């Protein structure tokens, strides 16, 4: 998957670890959305 920025990673991509994974169809089973204001399509999820 594509790495994405969780809320816990910091305010922006610069200098922060991207600990989430971007899923186009939403978070798979056992994962949770880790970004409150995500893109309109897909979700930034964490295991």
Swiss-Prot record:
GO biological process: regulation of signal transduction
Sorted UniProt keywords: Cardiotoxin, Disulfide bond, Ion channel impairing toxin, Nematocyst, Neurotoxin, Secreted, Toxin, Voltage-gated sodium channel impairing toxin
Tagged with keyword Cell wall biogenesis/degradation: no
Intrachain disulfide bonds: 4-44, 6-34, 27-45
Gene3D superfamilies linked to this entry: Anthopleurin-A
Keyword set includes Secreted: yes
Gene Ontology CC entries for this record: extracellular region; nematocyst
Subcellular location: Secreted; Nematocyst
GO MF annotation, one: toxin activity
Task performed by this protein: Modifies current passing through the fast sodium channel (Nav) in neuroblastoma cells, leading to delayed and incomplete inactivation. Paralyzes the shore crab (C.maenas) by tetanic contractions after intramuscular injection.
Family recorded in the similarity comment: Belongs to the sea anemone sodium channel inhibitory toxin family. Type I subfamily.
Protein name (record): Delta-actitoxin-Ael1c
């Amino acid at each position: 998957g594509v790495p994405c920025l969780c809320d816990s990673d910091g305010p922006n991509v610069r200098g922060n670890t991207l600990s989430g994974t971007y899923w186009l169809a939403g978070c798979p089973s056992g994962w949770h959305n880790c970004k409150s204001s995500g893109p309109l399509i897909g979700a930034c999820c964490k295991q």
